[in-house]
Amino acid sequence: MSFGITKTIPANEGMERVDSLYDGSVEDYEFHMAGKPSKLQVGDYVYTIFQDQIRGRLQIKELKGGATNPKSGKPRTLVFVAAPGERLAEPIPRKGHQGTRYYDGADWPAQ
């Protein structure tokens, strides 16, 4: 198991966004997380959900606090991940959601 968070890729970003995280076309990517993470660390993972399936995971390389949500004015943390990530051959069913949820990686296939 590998601890981390799940983030849903919005439908309007399309499968092209998901593909770019795993095909080598980008070297890093930035996710946003409300507040300051109490459990998350560099080396943990962001598991990406698209169309109600976990598609893969990317390792966290930096957590940068002090950012502000431009709409609400509330604090948030920027979560920088290394790409390309590990893409699943068979996606894992997982309901998409808004925001961030901690995830223990229990469904991730053993290597």
Task: Kindly give the residue locations of the regions a language model identified.
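Residue-level detector of short, conserved catalytic/binding motifs and their immediate flanks
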Residues: 44-46, 56
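Short, solvent-exposed secondary-structure boundary/capping segments
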Residues: 64-80
